[in-house]
Regions:
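C-terminal trimerization/auto-chaperone modules of long, extracellular attachment fibers and adhesins
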Residues: 2-7, 24-184
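Bacterial N-terminal signal peptides
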Residues: 10-18
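Sec/Tat signal peptide C-region and signal peptidase I cleavage site
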Residues: 19-23
Length: 184
């Protein structure tokens, strides 16, 4: 009986301690800079590739702040209160591989034998908010991958890639053909 009580007590201590640990994730580095960050990336010349959707009109339950790459017009878009806002502002987006024009990256992406439509990663206290990567904390932010001049330093970027350009201090999104830059 003493062993069972020790196991239950140990399990309770472990459970309570994990509930008190702040939800913070560092990708490509050892730790985040401070307690106000939920997700932070390392300093390599890499970006974050957004989820590809066939059409933003087909995305059900999207909440404000959702960011996707729309395959219908090859644009990076964000959801706001009045609808979807185009962040690409360019009509030449594509999913054709620039190194091999015979390859459409959509074909590669759609060539998946099994896809878990319910897959989700949540950082923070889970809610019912839909998404693939959901940052749940109300008092923490995500730090985008930081790259100096991504249009020069990211070799063969993927359509739907997003970074923070440290040279011009702007958000940069790639639509498959060109980078678009946004400042506050």
């Amino acid at each position: 009986m003493i062993i069972l009580n020790n196991i239950i007590t140990s399990a309770a201590v472990i459970l309570m301690s994990t509930l008190l640990i702040p939800a913070q994730v560092a990708v490509g580095k050892g730790s985040v800079q401070n307690s106000s960050i939920s997700l932070e990336f390392g300093n390599e010349n890499r970006g974050m590739i957004l989820p590809w959707v066939t059409n933003t009109g087909a995305v059900s339950g999207a909440v404000e702040g959702t960011v996707v790459y729309d395959l219908s017009d090859h644009k990076v878009k964000t959801k706001n209160i009045s609808g979807w806002k185009d962040l690409s502002v360019d009509l030449t987006g594509t999913t054709i591989d620039p190194l091999n024009s015979a390859v459409d990256l959509v074909t590669i992406q759609n060539n998946v034998t099994t896809e878990n439509l319910d897959a989700v990663v949540r950082i923070g206290t889970p809610t019912a908010t839909p998404g693939i990567l959901v940052l749940e904390d109300t008092n923490k932010a995500m730090i985008l991958p930081r790259v100096a001049s991504p249009h020069l330093n990211i070799i063969n970027p993927a359509p739907g890639m997003m970074v923070y350009d440290t040279t011009v201090k702007q958000l940069a999104v790639f639509n498959g053909t060109v980078w678009s830059f946004w400042k506050p």
